[in-house]
């Protein structure tokens, strides 16, 4: 969502796919340039042209979340009565649009050169049918049900209601495409006529497929799988944060492209329906479907045989590790139980021995005179007194010994029995491969050309300057070492690579430069140093469009990176880092945003670029 591809509008006629810039393209260009407050780059215009030439008949799915600003106001499992009172009217406004939104994603299609006749057909069928069905707001409120229904159930009800319109639309679409084949102008060249006929034939076949019960059931079932998986992923602690951050990232993209919308509609995403449904039928496992969904939605991978096999392996490996952990836990509990039984047996034996010794002493004292008995009694009291003094001394000694705990990064601090000392932040070291980006582009290039990382060699100065914009953000370290860190960054699972244990910290961010805003992730890559300290070896802002294209290391949330080997000795404490004199960088934080403004060293009133790191969405 939010990319140039996502906002190609319908317009103009079916003919004219070879025209330099169609009416539809002009419309899209105008919308995007207004949203970005700038002219589109040549590469972006070329992307629109490429997309305009593609016939796309893929049905979409809806991600059942409702955002309002930086808050999630409705989850898949949220009922109307559970919505915050201050957000109810807003949620009603979103729900009111569900019928039309679901309808458009069910019959979504893009035809090269524009297709106003298809757009008109979509609207005609909807307007003629929508009034027959119940109001989605009333349905969500659950007037007849005390508890109401969940948001995901509401989405499914709307899908089922809209299915009745799909057959009518498919029939009319197929007839219209056939009529247009008969009316292709004779002025077209044989090659143009062939292209037109092939395109219209595909549209006709698509319309006929929409009329089949199998295709309609596949639509509904695919959405049901998505709803169930979203709810399932949300309930898993280890997946919830990465999921909501990805949803929020796409939501931000949508807001930047369409900043003038009052209602923030749920996200629409493309996922191959046939692959989704067939995988569910084959494995019948919500764990596997959740993994497939995460790879497609969170890690920006398509659903193909390879990704499905990867998902199956991942789930099976996870279950194997869980079983091993359970076995180890059972073994630990059994060993603990055996140890406790052994200790209990020793205690019983000790008590029996003590009783026996006391009994023997009493019998011995009876054979002595009264004087001997009195001396034995005094001696026993003295021994008991010494034992009590020993216990008191032992307790005092243990109270004075402080406990030692290790802070993040290997720094050590004392902790008394009264409680942990407050105010301690996180401690990290910064690797030289991160610090190098604060140098000039020329120095960075010389260092990279001499370095061991092949992918960075022989880059042009222009490329280095572009990379410096997204890598020269070492000030982010001020946030990650602060107590506020966990409000902004999510920690991913650990993995092994190059002989080191690694993990990531990820936050949503917006990079502004020259009037352009880019939504993306702020990535912090870390590894465990030889002394146990945490070392930052990777730091960058990754634009969402780059992440989805599978460039530069893939997904922010994926377990992996493109750095093969790290020279562990090349790291330093970042506390002493300062930019050269004359360079000014301002950092501000209001609890919801951590903002870094990079200024012109020759004119500090001029802001060159701004990186804003956003708090994890409020739930």
Curated annotation (Swiss-Prot):
Q: What are the Basic and acidic residues biased-composition ranges?
A: 350-384
Instruction: List S-S links within the chain.
Output: none
**Disordered: annotated span:** 350-428
Lineage, top-rank taxon, reads: Eukaryota
Pfam families noted in UniProt: DUF1609, DUF3654
Give the Acidic residues compositional bias ranges: 385-399
Q: Which residues lie in Basic residues bias regions? A: 411-428
Q: What is the similarity comment for this entry?
A: Belongs to the UPF0329 family.
Q: What is this protein called?
A: UPF0329 protein ECU01_0100/ECU01_1510/ECU08_0030
């Amino acid at each position: 969502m939010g990319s140039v591809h996502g906002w190609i509008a319908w317009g103009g006629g079916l003919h004219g796919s070879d025209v330099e810039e169609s009416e539809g393209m002009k419309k899209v260009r105008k919308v995007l340039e207004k949203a970005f407050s700038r002219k589109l780059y040549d590469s972006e215009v070329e992307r629109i042209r490429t997309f305009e030439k593609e016939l796309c008949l893929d049905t979409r799915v809806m991600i059942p979340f409702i955002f309002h600003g930086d808050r999630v106001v409705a989850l898949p499992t949220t009922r109307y009565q559970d919505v915050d009172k201050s957000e109810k009217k807003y949620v009603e406004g979103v729900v009111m649009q569900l019928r039309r939104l679901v309808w458009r994603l069910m019959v979504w299609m893009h035809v090269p050169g524009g297709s106003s006749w298809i757009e008109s057909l979509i609207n005609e069928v909807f307007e003629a049918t929508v009034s027959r069905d119940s109001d989605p707001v009333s349905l969500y409120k659950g007037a007849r049900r005390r508890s109401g229904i969940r948001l995901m159930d509401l989405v499914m009800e709307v899908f089922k209601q809209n299915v009745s319109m799909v057959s009518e639309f498919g029939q009319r679409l197929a007839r219209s495409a056939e009529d247009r084949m008969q009316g292709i102008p004779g002025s077209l060249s044989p090659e143009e006529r062939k292209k037109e006929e092939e395109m219209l034939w595909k549209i006709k076949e698509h319309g006929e497929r929409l009329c089949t019960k199998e295709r309609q059931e596949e639509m509904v079932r695919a959405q049901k799988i998505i709803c169930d998986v979203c709810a399932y992923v949300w309930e898993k602690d280890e997946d919830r944060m990465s999921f909501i951050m990805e949803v929020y990232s796409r939501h931000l993209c949508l807001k930047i492209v369409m900043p003038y919308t009052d209602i923030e509609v749920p996200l629409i995403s493309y996922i191959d329906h046939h692959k989704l449904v067939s995988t569910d039928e084959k494995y019948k496992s919500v764990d596997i479907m959740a993994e497939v969904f995460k790879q497609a939605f969170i890690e920006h991978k398509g659903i193909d045989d390879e990704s499905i096999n990867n998902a199956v392996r991942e789930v099976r490996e996870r279950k194997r590790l869980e079983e091993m952990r359970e076995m180890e836990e059972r073994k630990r509990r059994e060993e603990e139980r055996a140890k406790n039984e052994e200790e209990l047996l020793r205690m019983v034996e000790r008590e029996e021995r003590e009783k026996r010794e006391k009994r023997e002493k009493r019998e011995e004292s009876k054979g002595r005179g009264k004087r001997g008995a009195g001396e034995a009694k005094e001696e026993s009291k003295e021994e008991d007194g010494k034992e009590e003094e020993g216990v008191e001394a032992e307790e005092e000694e243990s109270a004075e010994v402080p406990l030692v705990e290790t802070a993040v990064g290997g720094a050590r601090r004392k902790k008394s029995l009264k409680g942990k000392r407050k105010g301690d932040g996180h401690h990290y070291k910064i690797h030289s491969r991160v610090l190098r980006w604060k140098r000039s582009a020329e120095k960075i290039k010389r260092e990279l050309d001499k370095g061991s990382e092949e992918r960075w060699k022989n880059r042009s100065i222009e490329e280095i300057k572009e990379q410096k914009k997204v890598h020269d953000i070492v000030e982010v370290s001020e946030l990650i070492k602060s107590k506020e860190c966990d409000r902004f960054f999510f920690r991913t699972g650990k993995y092994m690579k190059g002989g080191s244990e690694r993990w990531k910290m990820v936050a949503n961010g917006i990079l502004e430069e020259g009037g352009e805003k880019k939504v993306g992730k702020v990535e912090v890559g870390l590894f465990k140093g030889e002394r146990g300290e945490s070392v930052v070896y990777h730091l960058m802002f990754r634009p969402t469009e780059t992440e989805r294209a599978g460039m530069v290391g893939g997904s922010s949330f994926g377990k992996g990176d493109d750095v093969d080997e790290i020279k562990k000795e090349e790291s330093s404490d970042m506390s002493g880092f300062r930019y050269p004199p004359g360079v000014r960088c301002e950092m501000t934080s209001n609890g919801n945003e951590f903002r870094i403004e990079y200024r012109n060293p020759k004119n500090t009133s001029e802001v060159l670029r701004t990186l804003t790191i956003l708090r994890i969405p409020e739930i």
